[in-house]
From Swiss-Prot:
This is Voltage-dependent anion channel-forming protein YneE. It comes from Escherichia coli O157:H7. It is found in: Cell membrane. InterPro entries: Bestrophin-like, YneE/VCCN1/2-like. Its main location: membrane.
């Protein structure tokens, strides 16, 4: 996620970091060079009686813009839902530890439970990003729990099971009444719902055929556009073609980023920062001495 301070409108025009321009610049350069080639080809295909007009490109451009808008809205809806789910995880984690800490007198046992919660957040983050988990989870889980988690097809769900087992032990030991156990178990169910929601987004992409047809149409439009522009614009064709192509290609590229909000690209969710905030909150609630530093944006204003 790009987290920038408010900028002057003129300065924002020239922003590079965080823009999709860095990803599509090579494609725009090819469009520029192809437009120059079309200028030299103009006498040849005019001599053959081939004539392109702007009318069909105007109609096609409007249609592409509408469908790009639909796709971007679908991608942004996934992004917003993903952010809401991680917000719910933060709320449920704080509430669960608060209820446990104010109920159970054993601080060492509560500390173990807090570390399970932190491990769950990091495990979910790394699962969604397909990152290795052993080194990070080893800081929070006991050896036997770590082995159980790593052996599972759903590590985050296994941690939830361990948390449920921990609550069951407290209930059997008489530390929790039936009513409190049900209340705390409901919190675990809330966290489980977050896990299922994130998995739904991560493993259900926007239909490939829809993405493919829009992607093809955008690039065919950008390839054919110089032939229609060159008749009237001549040597200005490369500049206008690149400007129009930038609009369509950048929207197509942005939609690809928003489709998977859990990645590490510029416009994805800052899961590292969210997990860091959860960890800091839970450790401070448990009066821990060692608190990690807050994750801040880098020099390019990117928060991962």
């Amino acid at each position: 996620m790009i987290v920038r301070p408010q900028q002057h409108w003129l300065r924002r025009i020239f922003v590079w970091h965080g823009s999709v321009l860095s990803k599509i610049s090579s494609r725009l350069l090819l469009n520029f060079l192809f437009s120059i080639a079309v200028i030299f080809m103009l006498p040849w295909y005019t001599h053959l009686g081939i004539k392109f007009t702007l009318a069909p490109f105007s109609i096609l451009g409007v249609a592409i813009a509408i469908f790009l808008g639909f796709r971007n809205n679908a991608g942004y809806a996934r992004y917003v839902e993903a952010r809401k789910l991680w917000g719910q995880l933060m709320i449920a984690s704080r509430s669960l530890l608060r209820e446990v800490k104010t109920t159970l007198p054993d601080s060492a046992s509560v500390r173990e439970f807090a570390r399970l919660q932190i491990a769950f957040a990091h495990c979910l983050r790394m699962t969604l990003r397909k990152q290795p988990q052993v080194e990070v989870l080893a800081h929070y889980l006991k050896t036997e729990d770590l082995q159980r988690v790593l052996a599972s097809n759903s590590p985050a769900n296994r941690i939830l099971l361990i948390m449920g087992e921990w609550l069951a032990v407290q209930r059997r030991n008489g530390q929790l009444s039936d009513i409190l156990f049900i209340s705390l178990n409901d919190r675990l169910n809330d966290i489980s719902a977050v896990l299922a929601g994130c998995e739904r987004i991560a493993y259900t992409p926007i239909p490939f055929a829809y993405t493919l047809i829009l992607h093809r149409t955008v690039y065919l439009f950008c390839i054919m556009l110089p032939f229609a522009l060159v008749v009237d614009l001549h040597y200005m064709t490369p500049f206008i073609s690149v400007l129009i192509s930038y609009t369509f290609i950048s929207l197509d590229c942005l939609a690809e980023e928003l489709e998977d909000p859990f990645g590490t690209e510029n416009n994805d969710l800052p899961l590292d920062a969210i997990c860091n905030a959860i960890e800091i909150d839970l450790l401070q609630m448990n009066d821990e001495a060692e608190i990690p530093a807050k994750v801040l944006p880098d020099r390019h204003y990117q928060l991962t």
